[in-house]
UniProtKB/Swiss-Prot annotation:
Residues 212-227 have a biased composition (Polar residues). Gene3D superfamilies: Calcium-transporting ATPase, cytoplasmic domain N, Calcium-transporting ATPase, cytoplasmic transduction domain A, Calcium-transporting ATPase, transmembrane domain, HAD superfamily/HAD-like. It comes from Rattus norvegicus (Rat). This is Sodium/potassium-transporting ATPase subunit alpha-2. This is the catalytic component of the active enzyme, which catalyzes the hydrolysis of ATP coupled with the exchange of sodium and potassium ions across the plasma membrane. This action creates the electrochemical gradient of sodium and potassium ions, providing the energy for active transport of various nutrients. GO terms for molecular function: ATP binding; ATP hydrolysis activity; ATPase-coupled monoatomic cation transmembrane transporter activity; P-type sodium:potassium-exchanging transporter activity; potassium ion binding; protein heterodimerization activity; protein-folding chaperone binding; sodium ion binding.
């Protein structure tokens, strides 16, 4: 909103030209909103204003006229952003992403059951059960995800202010309190310190009125408001107050010139809610994964469909096989696993003060490669603090730490006594009542930020300011105004022969002009050229640190001329304001938060670029950027190089400067190519004096570079950028409702350092999801191969559908989820951000490891157990080939085994179901080893250790569940699972050990020969 966003700029969105009229219309509106505010009410004289809005500037509107306008324009409120209806959100959870795969599986199962029912008198119910279970899984998981997100949005709703705002209007000459929603254009409104401005106002009269525009323009200093037209730009002029900003002090009257969505604030909110938001990285990953799995499933299904036709099966049977293979490829439990893993991480992050609004944002933060951070309140403490003083011709450092543990200075000098007295007396800030037990730095004050900083500084170093003011009562005052740039007050002295002292503070150069002497070590000496140079050097040094500098002076008024009780006249000045005595300078800054420099350092080592985007002054922005390490030591901007070499800036090659400070007014005239060049060529960037539209353009610029962008902000002005970013991060304490609504994540403690924790959690969950998926997919092979051999070799079915479900939704679930708790293998904050093009959640190497290597060993273990049991019962492997048709024939009750014994149909089926149970138990045994090897992707399990208690519980839980399913009475009827001999459990042990040894050797080669053939082929 501030200083012009590039008018020639058109957002990336506009490339989709063919989207029909509606889309074009919307894009046109968004482009309009990206431009600056156009209004001319600030240029009108009061008479013209009254005529334009048909209002009496002293009595206000009539009640009838106000009613008519309200009926015409509607209430003075922002249209809430279009929210997604709850049923749509629920359907997204039910039919989005991974769920589609399971729904297709369920439909195919019902189709297969239908075909069988048409063909046979007594069809097997397996497919029916499977279809029902698949549908149930999707519905339960969908409800769970929906509940999680609904819970987060409930927390969001609680942020909304429950109190209806009131406004003081004057109608028909009467003052009345009404609901702010009933304010109309043309209303005469009065605001005072502490009020929220109810609409956009044109000021017609004011008394010392200051407003806090920080949520709109990012300027942390309160801005003076008066009836004069001072600037062409409506956002800069003094005679306009904006809707939803706060009046800090003083009073003002104004005419309402815009309400609701037509206000400047309303425009920003509309801009934010109209932006298109892209897919999250994890959603893209899951889409890619579904394509891979579907590809594998369809390839296998079609291959065996063709093969079974060649082998002479009827086409109906072949279709049943096709469906069976596709369904067997669907990892039923994975959807639930991913959801639970993300939820667990979201809960962990909430404990560390990051509230994640939607689960997918958890991982987005981990892939972030650029953070565009606001300055005020995120990188800094959001409280002005006295940083330095200059008196007795030297600079003293004050304590700016959050817990007052920093530097101290010598307070014995009589000059400091005088300086502290002026700072305490020439000061209108006061502590709010009832805070005696709170430490001074944490107390709330009434008054502007700079005065509050002085008040706290003096209270900390000299004791009670209230007592000081009681001893020196104020008898006259000229408040600060923009023309003379000083504040002056006169106090009676109780502790001195002089009856009055005049104290003054203001812009240092203005104060110095009024002085003829200077106080050094308590003595007044003439203000000569040498002292003026010393002042100039100190002023430049403190200003160069990005600090706000104030000058202080005093004059002891002679008692003869000004006796006690003298009437001072502040309009027709009857006292001197020249030839004063200069005492010193004090400078203030909003200091960096303690944890930020460390957090910025961590981002740098994690390969994340931190860009500062602020509405503040370039010098201040650069000073804070250097203070927190966004511009690191030794890195120079073009201006720094020019100053060092003593040459004009135009002669410096911009590529030599690693750091860069861009002014909003320069950004306004840049083409998108020039912006891209800055973002590409400089590693450390600060944007100062930017408007909200420019913030949005910077985010879009970073995204054009292929970066995954996180944006932090607290003001309403940040909401378009928050919405556009891959992940928007709002501030929980200082943030406005609009910014929280637009963000994906909320920092409950407003601390930049919490973002770094979030990045770490996000990277960890991506690694752990990989492990979880690798673990889950591996058991697909021992589940599919029995079915394939059943088709090709015509053997009795080694593993039934129901037992597959017991693995996917029973024994595998807890172990897969337990991998979410696995600690990081190495320092994940020391590596570069993930490249979303190359580093996928599931890649071909993961599939080849899970399916082609570990899965195959598992299948061997299962078949070994299967053949052992059938051989013990008399069916040697050679007898089993081609036996399937007789085996499954209900009428054959005299089937001979290898030793000539005859078996009835029922007896055969009991042996077959016992094989199913044993195959299932074997998969559980080999999955033990799979779980342990999935703990790490590169390290040895012995380096990682078994510290993950949930994982140990998972191992015990899957074993206990398998034993329960095998030995519990009644399982033979319910799930057709039969008790096993103890020895049968041990058949798969050698295979389990083989998996463990095979993988440990592979990881050893990975560590010995990084980048070698083994890594290229098997490191996922």
């Amino acid at each position: 909103m501030g200083r012009g966003a590039g008018r020639e700029y058109s957002p990336a969105a506009t490339t989709a030209e063919n989207g029909g009229g509606k889309k074009k219309q919307k894009e046109k509106e968004l482009d309009e909103l990206k431009k600056e505010v156009a209004m001319d009410d600030h240029k009108l004289s009061l008479d013209e204003l009254g005529r334009k809005y048909q209002v009496d500037l002293s009595k206000g509107l009539t009640n009838q006229r106000a009613q008519d306008i309200l009926a015409r324009d509607g209430p003075n409120a922002l249209t809430p952003p279009p929210t997604t209806p709850e049923w749509v959100k629920f359907c997204r959870q039910l039919f989005g992403g991974f769920s589609i795969l399971l729904w297709i599986g369920a439909l195919l199962c019902f189709l297969a059951y239908g075909i069988l029912a048409a063909m046979e008198d007594e069809p097997s119910n397996d497919n029916l059960y499977l279809g029902i279970v698949l549908a149930a899984v999707v519905i339960v998981t969908g409800c769970f995800s929906y509940y999680q997100e609904a819970k987060s949005s409930k927390i969001m709703d609680s942020f909304k202010n429950m109190v209806p705002q009131q406004a003081l209007v004057i109608r028909e000459g009467e003052k009345m309190q009404i609901n702010a929603e009933e304010v109309v254009v043309g209303d005469l409104v009065e605001v005072k310190g502490g009020d929220r401005v109810p609409a956009d106002l044109r000021i017609i009269s004011s008394h010392g009125c200051k407003v806090d525009n920080s949520s709109l323009t990012g300027e942390s200093e309160p801005q003076t408001r008066s009836p004069e037209f001072t600037h062409e730009n409506p956002l800069e002029t003094r005679n306009i107050c904006f809707f939803s900003t706060n009046c800090v002090e003083g009073t003002a009257r104004g005419i309402v010139i815009a309400t609701g969505d037509r206000t400047v604030m309303g425009r920003i909110a509309t801009l934010a809610s109209g932006l298109e938001v892209g897919q999250t990285p994890i959603a893209m990953e899951i889409e890619h994964f579904i394509q891979l799995i579907t590809g594998v499933a369809v390839f296998l299904g079609v291959s065996f469909f063709v093969l079974s036709l060649i082998l002479g099966y009827s086409w109906l049977e072949a279709v049943i096989f096709l469906i069976g293979i596709i369904v067997a490829n669907v990892p039923e439990g994975l959807l639930a696993t991913v959801t639970v893993c993300l939820t667990l991480t979201a809960k962990r992050m909430a404990r560390k003060n990051c509230l994640v609004k939607n689960l997918e944002a958890v991982e987005t933060l981990g892939s972030t490669s650029t953070i565009c951070s606001d300055k005020t309140g995120t990188l800094t403490q959001n409280r002005m603090t006295v940083a330095h003083m200059w008196f007795d011709n030297q600079i003293h450092e004050a304590d700016t730490t959050e817990d007052q543990s920093g530097a101290t200075f010598d307070k014995r000098s009589p000059t400091w006594t005088a300086l502290s007295r002026i700072a305490g007396l020439c000061n209108r800030a006061v502590f709010k009542a009832g805070q005696e037990n709170i430490s001074v730095s944490k107390r709330d004050t009434a008054g502007d930020a700079s005065e509050s900083a002085l008040l706290k500084c003096i209270e900390l170093s000299c004791g009670s300011v209230r007592k000081m003011r009681d001893r020196n009562p104020k008898v006259a005052e000229i408040p600060f105004n923009s023309t003379n740039k000083y504040q002056l007050s006169i106090h009676e002295r109780e502790d001195s022969p002089q009856s009055h002292v005049l104290v003054m503070k203001g812009a240092p150069e203005r104060i110095l002009d009024r002085c003829s002497t200077i106080l050094v070590q308590g003595k007044e000496i003439p203000l000569d050229k040498e002292m003026q140079d010393a002042f100039q050097n100190a002023y430049m040094e403190l200003g160069g640190l990005g600090e706000r500098v104030l000058g202080f002076c005093q004059l002891n008024l002679p008692s003869g001329k000004f006796p006690r009780g003298f009437k001072f006249d502040t309009d027709e000045l009857n006292f001197p304001t020249e030839k004063l005595c200069f005492v010193g300078l004090m400078s203030m800054i909003d200091p960096p938060r303690a944890a930020v420099p460390d957090a910025v350092g961590k981002c740098r080592s994690a390969g994340i670029k931190v860009i500062m985007v602020t509405g503040d002054h370039p010098i201040t922005a650069k000073a804070i950027a250097k203070g927190v390490g966004i511009i690191s030591e030794g890195n120079e901007t073009v201006e720094d190089i020019a100053a060092r070499l003593n040459i004009p800036v135009s002669q410096v090659n911009p590529r030599e400067a690693k750091a860069c400070v861009v002014h909003g007014s320069d950004l306004k005239d840049m083409t998108s190519e020039q912006l891209d060049e800055i973002l590409r060529d400089h590693t450390e960037i600060v944007f100062a004096r930017t408007s909200p539209q420019q913030k949005l353009i910077i985010v879009e610029g970073c995204q054009r570079q292929g970066a995954i962008v996180a944006v932090t902000g607290d003001g309403v002005n940040d909401s378009p950028a928050l919405k556009k970013a891959d992940i928007g991060i709002a501030m929980g304490i200082s943030g406005s409702d609009v910014s929280k609504q637009a963000a994906d994540m909320i920092l409950l403690d407003d601390n930049f350092a919490s973002i770094v924790t979030g990045v770490e959690e996000g990277r960890l969950i991506f690694d752990n999801l990989k492990k979880s998926i690798a673990y889950t997919l591996t058991s697909n092979i021992p589940e599919i191969t029995p079915f394939l051999l059943f088709i090709i070799a015509n053997i009795p079915l080694p593993l039934g559908t129901v037992t597959i479900l017991c693995i996917d939704l029973g024994t595998d679930m807890v172990p897969a989820i337990s991998l979410a708790y696995e600690a990081a293998e190495s320092d994940i904050m020391k590596r570069q951000p993930r490249n979303s093009q190359t580093d996928k959640l599931v890649n071909e190497r993961l599939i080849s490891m899970a399916y082609g290597q570990i899965g195959m060993i598992q299948a061997l273990g299962g078949f070994f157990t299967y053949f052992v049991i059938l051989a013990e019962n008399g069916f040697l492997p050679s007898r089993l080939l081609g036996i399937r048709l007789d085996w499954d024939d209900r009428t054959t009750n005299d089937l001979e085994d290898s030793y000539g014994q005859e078996w009835t149909y029922e007896q055969r089926k009991v042996v077959e179901f016992t094989c199913h149970t044993a195959f299932f138990a074997s998969i559980v045994v080999v999955q033990w080893a799979d779980l342990i090897i999935c703990k790490t992707r590169r390290n040895s399990v012995f380096q990682q250790g078994m510290k993950n208690k949930i994982l140990i519980f998972g191992l015990l839980e899957e074993t206990a569940l398998a034993a329960f399913l095998s030995y519990c009475p009644g399982m033979g009827v319910a799930l057709r699972m039969y008790p096993l001999k103890v020895t049968w459990w041990f058949c798969a042990f050698p295979y389990s050990l083989l998996i463990f040894i095979y993988d440990e050797v592979r990881k050893l080669i990975l560590r010995r020969y990084p980048g070698g053939w083994v890594e290229k082929e098997t490191y996922y």
